[in-house]
């Protein structure tokens, strides 16, 4: 029951931060809230027992990205104001892309299906070859340090 309360609280907090990011016009506030969004995502990953993913999200999403955004802010003119124009072509393209994504989701395998293609190809390869190919005994460390390093 406590885990459910924590999950609901973190998801509500994540949605609130996302709404605040969209509604805020101040660039500095958006950067700070983006860092808060990443930290909240990291907390959700910790609650899901994915501590390695949480650590990566906290380090990259809240740490390095926030520092880089703040560094870029030094090059953004303070007096520049965005125009209030609406681009209907961009809106139609976004709606079309969203419709195509929804169509593609219907073709995905069922959630948790052990016979889906991803479980037949990649996971067995990681489990059998990670120790001998990279000489790291822990499979999770191998995937994070070697294979995910390309991301």
Q: Language model features by range: what are they?
A:
Residues 1-150:
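Alpha-helical transmembrane segments of multi-pass membrane proteins predominantly involved
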